[in-house]
């Protein structure tokens, strides 16, 4: 591009703010494009983007990208490929949810194996350790139940896949509202990171979220994964920053127009 951008990032929370059309998403996309799908970056200078990381000699980084626009699918994915009913998957958020369900099943197998291993060691604190291992999943379920309480939806805890109960009826995630899907995508993405160091990129996550959900978003993410580094763009920082005002950066502050 024509502008030189230098953005010094905080280890935990980074909020890039600016009006529409100022280049927030472009900056975020440039960084993401500098990383391969597996998080590798053989050089710290890629496609006009120089990345400085800690530790300095790192050659790959764990990351997730969440985009908030729930557009209809232009090219519906074939049902055979996904082994599910095409009628269920109508939007981009539905596709994200579908793949997150697979990751969620893997995550549960993983923590189940760790709990079994822990109990087999038969140490005096084995039960306590097992509880600690399963705590993030329970916290995730509690958080979703709390967020969805106004509409009477609760997660069915006996199911391996995510299903909801609402006044005696069972719902799939694809039957949720756009805002509910968006929040589920964000928190599920963070849960399956399994509390490991990750970079979480989010492009205007507030778009379809209730105002009170926007205000809680950053704290909820950090509660599920204290080791995550959040890098997000927003055009309404006053809403989303709730206690994080010092982590807000205006695009104009980091852009050299010369």
Model region roles, listed by residue range:
Residues 1, 6-8, 29-175:
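Phosphate-coordinating catalytic segments in nucleotide- and nucleic-acid-processing enzymes
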Residues 1-38, 157-258:
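Switch/communication elements of ASCE P-loop NTPase nucleotide-binding domains
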């Amino acid at each position: 591009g024509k502008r030189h951008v230098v953005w010094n990032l905080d280890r935990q929370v980074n909020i890039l703010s600016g009006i529409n059309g100022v280049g927030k998403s472009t900056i975020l996309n440039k960084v993401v494009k500098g990383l391969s799908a597996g998080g590798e970056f053989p050089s710290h200078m890629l496609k006009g983007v120089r990345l400085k990381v800690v530790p300095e000699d790192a050659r790959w980084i764990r990351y997730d990208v969440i985009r908030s626009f729930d557009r209809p699918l232009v090219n519906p994915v074939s049902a055979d490929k996904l082994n599910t009913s095409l009628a269920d998957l109508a939007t981009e958020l539905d596709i994200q949810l579908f793949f997150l369900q697979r990751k969620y099943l893997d995550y549960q197998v993983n923590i189940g194996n760790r709990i079994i291993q822990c109990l087999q060691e038969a140490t005096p604190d084995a039960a306590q350790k097992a509880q600690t291992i399963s705590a993030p999943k329970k916290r995730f379920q509690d958080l979703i139940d709390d967020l969805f309480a106004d509409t009477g939806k609760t997660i069915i805890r006996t199911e391996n896949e995510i299903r909801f109960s609402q006044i005696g009826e069972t719902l799939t995630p694809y039957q949720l509202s756009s805002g509910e899907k968006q929040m589920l995508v964000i928190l599920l993405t963070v849960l399956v990171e399994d509390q490991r160091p990750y970079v979480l990129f989010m492009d205007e996550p507030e778009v379809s979220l209730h105002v009170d959900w926007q205000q809680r978003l950053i704290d909820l993410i950090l509660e599920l994964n204290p080791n995550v580094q959040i890098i997000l763009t927003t055009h309404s920082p006053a809403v989303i920053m709730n206690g994080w005002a010092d982590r807000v950066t205006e695009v104009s502050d980091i852009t050299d127009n010369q």
